[in-house]
Amino acid sequence: MTKKEQALIEQYAKSLVEVASEHHSLDALQADVLAILETFVTTNLDQSLSSLAVPHAEKIKLLTLLKGNNSVYMNNFLNLILQNEREAYLYQMLQTVLNEIAIVSNQYDVTVTSSLPLTEEQKSRVRAVVAKKFAVTAGRLIEKVDPSLIGGFIISVNNKVIDTSIRRQLQAFKMNLK
């Protein structure tokens, strides 16, 4: 992706977040974006929208299906994308919208990787640790299970990581023995 394309994507995303923020609709926008991104993942819609083989009329039909229960701001955004023929960039724009919402609201997704599934008590403790250590509000808690960690956990928030896994400790111990 070129710098020009990246700047275009960021401008569209920032504008949408700015409008939603002015109207106190960030939560609704975030829900809309997550639902549409889920559709992208389950249907490979991104490939269809970015393909030159798919006619513009077909792309209009596909995006019209996405307009269902969205907020006014999201539907206006989708109309603007269609009008300016920027469908190929929609997936990246929506990803950038989520990043912008996180920055504006200081609310980031938290990814927790552990060797076993977390209990509700552990999840609430993770949220407390995230709030204290990273000075952010925990957004969605994304839980991953990786038995190779042996024990402990890895918390990842906004490109920052806390790794207390036994696997990492064993690797560090192994390096110290060399």
Curated annotation (Swiss-Prot):
It is a peripheral membrane protein. It is found in: Cell membrane. The keyword Ion transport applies. GO terms for molecular function: proton-transporting ATP synthase activity, rotational mechanism. InterPro entries: ATP_synth_OSCP/delta_N_sf, ATPase_OSCP/dsu. Coiled coil: none annotated. Keywords: ATP synthesis, Cell membrane, CF(1), Hydrogen ion transport, Ion transport, Membrane, Transport. The keyword Membrane applies. It comes from the Bacteria. GO terms for cellular component: plasma membrane; proton-transporting ATP synthase complex. Pfam families: OSCP. PANTHER family: ATP SYNTHASE DELTA CHAIN. F-type ATPases have 2 components, F(1) - the catalytic core - and F(0) - the membrane proton channel. F(1) has five subunits: alpha(3), beta(3), gamma(1), delta(1), epsilon(1). F(0) has three main subunits: a(1), b(2) and c(10-14). The alpha and beta chains form an alternating ring which encloses part of the gamma chain. F(1) is attached to F(0) by a central stalk formed by the gamma and epsilon chains, while a peripheral stalk is formed by the delta and b chains. F(1)F(0) ATP synthase produces ATP from ADP in the presence of a proton or sodium gradient. F-type ATPases consist of two structural domains, F(1) containing the extramembraneous catalytic core and F(0) containing the membrane proton channel, linked together by a central stalk and a peripheral stalk. During catalysis, ATP synthesis in the catalytic domain of F(1) is coupled via a rotary mechanism of the central stalk subunits to proton translocation. Belongs to the ATPase delta chain family. This is ATP synthase subunit delta. The gene is atpH.
